[in-house]
Swiss-Prot record:
Gene: SIFaR
Protein name as it appears in the record: Neuropeptide SIFamide receptor
TM spans (from-to): 105-125, 213-233, 255-275, 283-303, 324-344, 387-407, 437-457
CDD domains tied to this protein: 7tmA_CCKR-like
PROSITE patterns: G_PROTEIN_RECEP_F1_1, G_PROTEIN_RECEP_F1_2
Record keyword Electron transport present: no
Spans annotated as Disordered: 1-33, 532-553
UniProt xrefs under Pfam families: 7tm_1
Role this protein plays: Receptor for the neuropeptide SIFamide. Modulates sexual behavior by playing a role in male sex discrimination. Also involved in promoting sleep.
Tissue-specificity statement: In the larva, expressed in a bilateral pair of neurons in each of the abdominal neuromeres. In the adult, expressed predominantly in the central nervous system with expression also detected in two neurons in the uterus.
Length: 758
């Protein structure tokens, strides 16, 4: 967002024919011949210089004094003295070093100048440099005159030691100032760009106010929105997915742009000199380059993650790999932009602008620009490191990834009307929604930065910029810089379209705590972006294949449920389910996975029943999960018989729990069970025949069991053995764990309709 920098190209001005140039005269100690208006001005100055014997001291790089010293025709008088116009060549400063040029002549020149410059001539950087002093020795000391305050005759008298007559002449002329600033321009090098001559402000007050409002809106929306995105992902464990990690990284880069670069860009669009000092001149361009590079590389990582997930579901990107990639993104961004840190520096305004542009302020003014060592081509670095590495090449790679993703999704056919086909369609629809959102993020990124890159490329690699082009660039440049900055606040608006982020934003707004966990949980952060979705796609295609055990997946997670106020049982399994998954949508809109399992289990009476089937009389059922197989069984007993459940861990853990007798079959069957799995899939079947709404949650290879009474979980890697007798049976329940710890929690106070998750 830094403006293109360059050195001064001193432009040769066209010759102009002097028009009528009336000027005021006054009585002075040393008379000056009266000149004809306009036509005689140049001759008068030449004669004065010739009399001084110092015509050759008129330096080159002449600023068109006819434009600079437009005589005020309202004065209606022609007088002595004048200025050299185009015939004197090209000089930005007139150096008169002979006592023959008296302060009267100088006063006449100053009068015509101050009568035609701005009321606040401090805005005039195009200066008339003239030197003269009357001295007893007859020599004049050369000094540069900067017309900085036309209303202050004391300034000139003190600077040049003028006579009282000349001082009064300047004061009188200052009271009748009339000028037209259209001819007064700065000359900026890269393309002979003529900047407005105002040494302090680039734009009018009205335009500056418009820029302030626009930048403040971007600052507030971007800072709050990106902070919300980071908070949603960090505070909700279910949002911590690979894709969301890259989105958080993108939000961090946007916050850096907003905090460090946005205010500096606004100040640079209002003021001509650099107002923030040497350290910020080094730091701001560097942080801007780092943050933009990190944003681009994060978008590349997201597109590659989606591409791999769609084309090769088995080659998943783990969270550990995602963290390594994020570290690599920042290392590359920090290294590739080091030249901005080294070669941006403060440059005095006198070295940047032509000799005529001499600042009249007491403190020297500086500009923040690129200062490359001799023999180094800074344009080449811009071409390779910025335009190609941070824009053209990344955008091409991202476009290719999403085109291939779209081809894969659009050509995939799901025949039939089975429940499995319906589930696949819903999965595919969810993936397409996520891809559309990410594509929108990329397109807006390209459009936001495109105008600024085009302008920089035109300035650095194009021909000389004409006056008309400069007038356009002067208005377009701040808008292009604002568009690039506004990209930092667009992404949170796009994320709010996603239901999970929208709920997370609402939860943060309602939450009083800024650091606690959100009560909002959903099954996935962004549908189809989690690791489990890739696994489920694999199981559809390779149902009999057993997934390898992964250390990263061996996660136990116990929720502190606010409704039940107790720990839930968690069981981690690594077995494989040989059947398909069905997708179900509950009342809350979360898409859940149900298992269709054709294996069988035996109840206490030895009857073989299919798993996941519900009889109308509420008979015993079994539950199974994807990525681990868990079956649940209970025995119905007559009134008066007690229940003695035994949880047996074949690894060496067993527990006998006695229950009170007298429980009836109906009271047992009326108990509601809830099962929750994470990063795999579990199905839930109610014991009662009437339709009930069930809620399932998934997250990371963990299954949880919450019951109002003692129950039984069985891992379907090995058969479950039921111990029965001839007498009225006391059912023995067996619970087996494989490779992670099992926690079991129960409550004696029944809560039938308590939701496990808010």
């Amino acid at each position: 967002m830094m403006a293109a920098s360059g050195r001064i190209r001193k432009r040769k001005h066209k010759s102009h024919t002097s028009g009528d140039v009336p000027s005021t005269t006054t009585s002075v100690p040393m008379p000056i011949p009266t000149m004809a208006p306009g036509k005689m001005v140049a001759e008068t100055m030449e004669e004065a210089a010739a009399l001084a014997g110092d015509y050759n001291n008129f330096t080159h790089n002449f600023v068109d004094l006819q434009n600079l010293l437009s005589f005020n025709e309202l004065n209606g008088t022609s007088g002595s003295g004048g200025t050299a116009v185009s015939s004197l060549g090209s000089s930005s400063a007139i150096k008169l070093n002979n006592s023959a040029i008296t302060d009267t002549l100088l006063g006449t020149v100053l009068t015509t100048a101050t009568a035609t410059v701005a009321p606040a001539a401090s805005s005039l950087l195009a200066t008339l440099a003239a030197t003269t002093t009357a001295s007893a020795r007859g020599s004049l000391a050369g000094k540069s005159l900067a017309i900085a305050d036309a209303t202050s005759s004391t300034y000139y008298s003190n600077l040049l030691n003028l006579s009282p007559a000349t001082t009064s002449l300047i004061s009188a002329a200052a009271a009748t100032k009339s000028y037209n600033d259209s001819a007064l321009r700065w000359e900026q090098l890269d393309g002979s760009v003529d900047f407005g001559f105002d040494p302090l402000y680039r734009h009018s007050l009205a335009m500056s106010m418009v820029y302030c409002v626009a930048y403040i809106v971007v600052f507030l929306v971007g800072l709050i929105g990106n902070s919300f995105v980071i908070a949603v992902v960090l505070r909700a464990p279910r949002m911590r997915t690979v894709t969301n990690y890259f989105i958080v990284n993108l939000a961090i880069a946007d916050i850096l742009v907003i905090v460090f670069c946005l205010p500096a860009t606004l100040i640079g669009n209002i003021f001509v000199p650099w107002m923030l000092g040497w350290l910020m001149c080094k730091f701001v361009p560097y942080i801007q380059g780092v943050s933009v590079a990190a944003s681009v590389y994060s978008l590349i990582a997201v597109s590659l993650d989606r591409f791999i997930a769609i084309w090769w579901p088995l080659k998943q990107m783990t969270k550990r790999r995602a963290r390594i990639m994020i570290i690599g993104i920042w290392v590359i961004a920090l290294v590739t932009t080091i030249p901005w840190l080294l070669f941006f520096d403060l440059v005095p305004a006198e070295e940047v602008f032509s000799d005529a542009l001499v600042s009249a302020y007491s403190q020297p003014q500086f500009l923040c620009q690129e200062v490359w060592p001799p023999g180094t081509d800074g344009n080449l670095y811009f071409l390779l490191a910025n335009l190609v590495a941070c824009y053209l090449l990344p955008m091409s790679l991202i476009t290719l990834c999403y085109v291939l993703i779209w081809i894969k999704v659009s050509t995939r056919s799901i025949p039939g009307e089975s429940k499995d086909a319906q589930m696949d369609r819903m999965q595919q629809k969810s993936k397409v929604k996520v891809i559309k959102m990410l594509v929108a993020v990329v397109i807006l990124f390209v459009l936001s930065w495109l105008p600024l890159y085009v302008i920089f490329a035109r300035i650095k690699f194009g021909s000389d910029i004409s006056q008309e082009e400069f007038e356009i660039l002067k208005k377009v440049m701040p808008v292009a810089q604002w568009l690039g900055s506004s990209n930092s606040c667009i992404n949170p608006i796009l994320y709010s379209v996603n239901k999970k982020y929208r709920r997370g934003f609402a939860a943060i707004i309602k939450s009083r705590s800024c650091c606690g966990r959100l009560r909002y949980y959903d099954n996935v952060a962004i549908a189809s972006s989690t690791t489990s979705t890739r696994k489920s796609s694999h199981y559809h295609q390779n149902s009999s294949r057993k997934s390898p055990s992964s250390k990263g997946n061996a996660v136990s997670y116990i929720y502190e449920h606010n409704s039940l106020r107790r720990h839930n049982m968690m069981l981690k399994q690594d077995s494989n389910l040989s059947q398909q998954m069905l997708l179900k949508q509950d009342s809350h809109g979360s898409r859940q996975f149900l298992i269709k399992q054709e294996s069988s289990c035996s109840d206490a009476s030895g009857i073989r029943r299919p798993l996941c089937q519900q009889d109308s009389n509420g008979s015993k059922v079994s539950l199974s999960k994807q990525d681990s197989i868990v079956s649940y069984m209970e025995a119905r007993r007559s009134a008066g018989h007690g229940l003695n459940d035994t949880l047996v861990d074949r690894d060496s853990v067993s527990m006998d729990v006695g229950r009170r007798q007298g429980a009836t079959p109906s009271s047992l069957l009326d108990k509601r069970q809830k099962f929750v799995k994470q990063d795999s899939v579990i199905s839930f079947v109610d014991q009662r025949p009437e339709q009930r709404r069930h809620q399932l949650v998934k997250q990371d290879s963990v299954i949880s069991f919450a019951d109002q009474r003692r129950g039984l979980l069985h891992k379907q890697d090995s058969l479950m053995a039921n111990r029965t007798g001839d007498a009225p049976t006391h059912h023995v329940s067996i619970l087996k764990k494989t490779d992670s710890q099992l926690s079991y929690g129960s409550s004696t106070s029944p809560r039938r309709n308590a939701d496990l998750y808010e």
